[in-house]
Structures are given as C-alpha cells and as structure tokens.
Amino acid sequence: MTDKKIALARVFRALLVVCLFLVIAVTIRYFFSHRRPASVEAIKIKDIPEQKVEKQEGIEHYDFKGDRVIQAKADRHYAGSDTLYYLEGNVEIREIKKGEGKERIVRGDKITYDKDWNEVILEGQASLEQSDVLVKAPTLFYRKNPETLSTERGALFSSNRISGRAKQLFYSFAEESLRLEGDVEIQLRHGPESPDALALKADVFIYSRPGKRGHAAGKVTFSLGKNHGQADSLEFKFTPNEQQIEKIELKGGVKASLVAEEEVPITEGDLLLAKAREREVEAEEISLSAFPDMPKMESLEAKGNCFMKSAAASGSLVEVRSEAMKMLFDRQGGLREFRAWNQARLLEKQKDGSLKRLLSGQEILVEGQGEKLGVRAGTSEAALLDSQDSEVVAREIRLFPQREIMEAAEEVKAILKPQPEKAEAVGFFAREKPVFIKAHMMRFEQQQNRLFFRGDIRMWQDKDMLLAQQMTVLKDTGEIVGEGLVRAVFSLRPKKEEDKEERVELGGEKMNYKPKENLLTFEQTTWLKTRTASLNANSLLVSMAEKSADIQTIKARGKVVVVDKLREGQSEEALYDLSEETMVLTGNPVVTDKEKGVLRGDKLTFRLGDDRILVENKEKERSATVIKREQ
C-alpha cells in the first residue's frame, strides 16, 4: 500500500514538471511572437523644465478644442516657465467653429496663449479677421469666455459698412457689438450707389450688428458730402440688409448745415425757404430719415429751440424759429413740405437788410416748392403777417408767393401802415395815418395791388369809419367799392373850439369812392344821419375835400325824404352843405310840419342851425318865405 502511494506521487510530480515546461515554452513563444518596437516618448512642452525648453522653428500646429479647430503657423514656437505658450514671427492662426463654417484669422508678430486658448495676446502688427470684420492694432487681447477682443493701444476697424479708428476698442463676438473710445473717427458707408460716407468724430462709438444700430457720444461732429454739423450725441440705424443708413438721430446742442446737390434758380416771387440750396438748422434734437430704396434724405425732424436759416446769393435771408420743425424732400433733393409748430416764427429780409415780411403763429406750413405758405393760430395766439406796408392778424393766413396772393380767414384784424411817401391812399383815409380793419376774410392780390374783405367789415382811422359786408380797395388808385349794409361815419370838425365834435353817418347797399373825382357814392336804400336830421334817398353823392376825408357837400337823389325834428321834407333831390349847415330840397319839394301844415315851393332850404326853412318859388316874380319854429 505504501509502495503504491509512493509510485502515484512520483507520477503526479512528473506530470507537474511537464506542465510547467509547457507553460514556460508557450510563454517564451508568445513573447517572441508578439514583441513591439521600442516606443518614442512624445514631446510634452509643459513637462519640460525651463532649462531644457527648446524652440521649434517653422512650426505648423493643429489643435482640436471641443467645437473649434485651430491651425497655427509661426517661425518659432515655445512654452515658457509661466505655463503660457508663445508663437513668434509671421504668426497666423486660423480658427473654424464646427457647424458655423466661419473662419477667423489672427495675425501678428507675437502671440501668447494658454493651453486652452482661453486668453490670447497678439502683439506687433496684430490683426483679426472674421467674415467682413477686420481689426488691426499694435496689441490685441482675446478672451474666450465671454468671447471678446479688446485693446487700449489704438485700433483700426473695418467692415462692409463701417470703418474707423480709436484709442480703445472692445468687440463682443457673441453680441456682434463694437465699442470704440478716445479720438474716435468713423466712416459709415451710405448705400452702395452713394459716393459719400457719413464721417463721424466722437469720444465714444458703439454699434450693435444684430440691431443694426449705432451710437456716438461726446463732442460729435459729422459730415456727409457737403452736409456737416455737430451734436452731443448721434444715433443711427442701418436698413435690415445693412445696405444704407435708414435713420440718424442727433441730440444735444445740434447744429447742421444741409446743402442740396444742385442749386435751384430763385426768381422774383419765389419763396427762399423752399428753394434755398443751403439751410442751417439748430435744435436740441434732429432726426434725419432716408428714402427706403435710395441713399437720399427724405425727411428732417427737429425738436426744442429750433432755428433754421437760409440765404440767397443776392443777399436775401430767411429765418425760422419754433419748438418743432419737419421738412420733407423729394428724390431730387428739393423741399416738398416744411412745417414748424409751437411758437413758430418766420422772418424774411431783403438784400438791403430791411424787413420783407414776418409770420408767426402756432404753425407755419410750406407746401410744394413754395407754392403755398400758411400760418395757423393756436388756442392762445393768433396768426400774424407783418410787412413794410401792413400787419394782419387772423386765425389762419395763407400766402401764394408765386401768384403773389395773400389770404386771411377768421377774426381778421389788419393795419394798413402809413405811407406818406406814396401817392396812393386807402380810399378817403389819410395816408399819413394807419388804417385799421376788422373782417371775417381778407385777400390781397399783389399784381393788381387789390385788397378784398368780406364779412362784418369795419375799417376806421381816428373817428372816421367804414362798415360793409364786402369791400374792395384798389391801392394804386385808392378806389373803394363796398356792398351789403354799407355804412360810413365821418367826424365833423367843430367851427369853434368850445363846440362839441359832431359826426355824420351815411349808408346804403352799395358804395363807391373815386379819388380822382373826390366823390363817394352810395346806392340802393341810402340814408344819412346827423345830430338833428336824417335823410333817405335812392342814392347819395358825397363830395370830399382833396387829399382829406373832410366832407364838403352831400347830394341825395331819388325819393328824398328828410326828417328834421317835427318836420318832414320830400323831394327828388337834396343838397346838404356841411359848412353852411343847410339842406336844400329841389324837385317838387314838400315839407310837412306837424304844427304849421304843408309847405310847397320850387326850392326849400332847411337851416339846421336855427330851425328855419326858406321857401323859394320860381315864378314871374320871385318870392321867398322864411318860416321859423317857435321855441
């Protein structure tokens, strides 16, 4: 039993030895059959101690950082002891974001960056280019989060529509916004077809590309072609396709000089405001808008202490002041509408500096190229037109300069100024004194030198007065024609200083004054009144003293009726002599006295001063009877 156990143990030991040799053999075979070539350790710049750093020459490096692919070229590349990496000499870095396809190109003499490209410093002729954006500066600082580019050492910036320079630059890639500060100079290209660019100078400039809006502040000056000006701040907006400037807003002490592309000839009667080539505008705020399909100004709006001035080569001048203004232009640059409101005032001066006309009111409106000029009153102020020879106040005043016509409507008040040096007078009123007029409507036609009034007209000078519903005044001749309840009131000079001043009133449906004949005529249902007597007739002929409004005689014709206290006279004609204080009735005159009965004669003379009546008959033997009422 013991021998069998020993034999089995030996067999088992032998098997183990065989198995061991087999394992060793297989292992040796596997080792020799799967042997790898000797590995070359990769260079890791960050792991190399400073004393062992080596510069790589003429490198081209690719780096994959998340969604970014970075390609770097340079004459030299090395890592510093500060854990930063350096590229030097003709450095160019191209970066593409996956999915966007936008390539960003960075160039410079030297670039410093960290391993994740979170912060990059570009030095020496540094530039960054992406799409149409190009930035150049001596030094540029790039930050990845948030992704920005900045410098404080002066920069140049350009894109399809904007280019310029400044001391400081800050650009946000995510917001596509640009900020420039310090001695900013900007060029905004105003449309693909426009040869001119909007040039800006300011302390600060900001532009947001998504909003197509920009802002300039701090001593802003601007120019566009021959147009130029200044303001505290300027805002602009491009059209959605960024092809042209859509709107410009200027704020704070704005001054602008606007020059039309072509000069429009100005002839006699033209409105300088409408056809002036150059306009100087001042206001607290000015907004300029362009046509949507062409780079030309369509409108200008101004607010706050507005002032506009235009001058002609001849020396004539126009100035406008108001709280608000608006101008609309046509596609050729001509003015098609002008509006000024809130305390609006327009002043025109002739080439010798004298006043041509002054207009003021709540609103001044120019339509067309000066075809119509209107002034409207406000709730507390009337419309005013003041010129060398007249002053007109109304609710609304309209001028048609090319036709030389003026119209005034509603609550019209006019003053015809004294014109002693001119031959013509206003009707029978003295030329040495002003004539005052009230009416519902007034019209003046310069070519005919004719005035027309309508509606409850009242014209007066001192105590002499003329009233009617319609009235025409020919200024060249001084002739006056009136219609509709015409009434004239004349003051009579007292013969003695102690006597009271008296007056005589005349009226009719129609009136005509002829200065050459010194004759004032009333027709249709005419009448006359004095302190003591009244008269009615078909017509009245008033003889006036030459060059004055003094009445000499009044002749009545047709169905004359005279009433003097208790007496009534009737005749075909009557002659009233104011200096003699007599009224002579002819043409079958008859006087009816309530106390003395009926008097007849060929001629009856009322002596208004002493209540006597002289009766005359033209028979073979002339007879005269004097009748006096008892006191």
How should these model regions be labeled?
Residues 1-631:
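Mature-chain termini and adjacent capping regions
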